[in-house]
A protein has these predicted regions:
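Hydrophobic alpha-helical transmembrane segments of multipass membrane transporters and ion channels
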Residues: 22, 62-70, 103, 192, ...
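Transmembrane alpha-helical segments of multi-pass transport proteins
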Residues: 134-137, 148, 185-215
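Membrane-embedded alpha-helical segments of multi-pass transporters/permeases
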Residues: 2, 6, 29, 72-80, ...
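Short runs within selected transmembrane alpha-helices of multi-pass transporters and secretion channels
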Residues: 20, 27, 31-35, 96-146, ...
Length: 215
């Protein structure tokens, strides 16, 4: 918000904060769900084989996808009419910005299962410097892109830094150190889940756009 306020204007920063208020609220709900699973998964890893733990991780990963695809689709479809009702027409972002916010929420949320395993296994050492690298990339790109692209530039910086660092490093670390297996299957599932989520979003948006207006 500080970069947006300095690089764009205070009004846009305020509108952005309203959108992120919804996103953070959804994240708080999902965090409560996954935080409740940490101890159980940690106990599972200590009492079962790596193969059994990996099979349970795949179930958890699918559960992760179900939650975040549902919330992402709901946010994208409902966000504009909700913000129009709540804040008025002057507080709406264009569809491109809403799409970037939705993508940021989805990609960040799809890390929940990986983060849960890392926390349960207590694996922090291999990952200790990557957050600093991600932050440096994010900040540098945001400062470069905010002038030509505005808020979209800040969101693109968030997505690029997330994609360049934790998208690759965190899954690799847990698959190598916890499950002792390759990471290829993880990314294949990720692509399939993303494709299904995108199709579901487009279908939902199409259906909602053809519903008769209320009132």
């Amino acid at each position: 918000s500080m970069i947006i306020a300095r690089g764009v204007d205070l009004i846009s920063a305020g509108i952005y904060s309203n959108y992120m208020l919804i996103v953070n609220g959804l994240n708080n709900i999902t965090n409560q769900v996954f935080n409740g699973i940490v101890a159980s998964f940690g106990n599972l890893m200590s009492t079962s084989t790596r193969e059994k733990a990996y099979e349970n991780f795949k179930v958890l990963y699918f559960f992760n996808y179900l939650i975040y695809s549902f919330f992402s689709i709901s946010f994208f479809v409902i966000c504009v009419p909700f913000m129009k009702l709540w804040m008025g027409n002057d507080s709406l972002f264009p569809i491109a910005t809403v799409s970037l916010i939705t993508l940021y929420f989805y990609i960040g949320g799809m890390r929940q299962a990986v983060n849960l395993v890392r926390t349960s296994a207590g694996i922090y050492q291999p990952d200790q410097y990557f957050p600093l690298i991600e932050t440096a990339i994010n900040l540098g790109l945001a400062l470069i892109l905010v002038k030509p692209l505005g808020i979209n530039g800040v969101l693109v910086a968030n997505l690029v830094s997330m994609f360049l660092v934790p998208f690759w490093t965190q899954p690799y670390i847990i698959h190598k150190n916890v499950f002792d297996t390759g990471v290829k299957n993880y990314y294949l599932r990720y692509c399939v889940y993303a494709a299904v989520a995108l199709f579901s979003l487009l279908l939902t948006q199409f259906i909602c756009s053809h519903l008769p207006a209320m009132g």
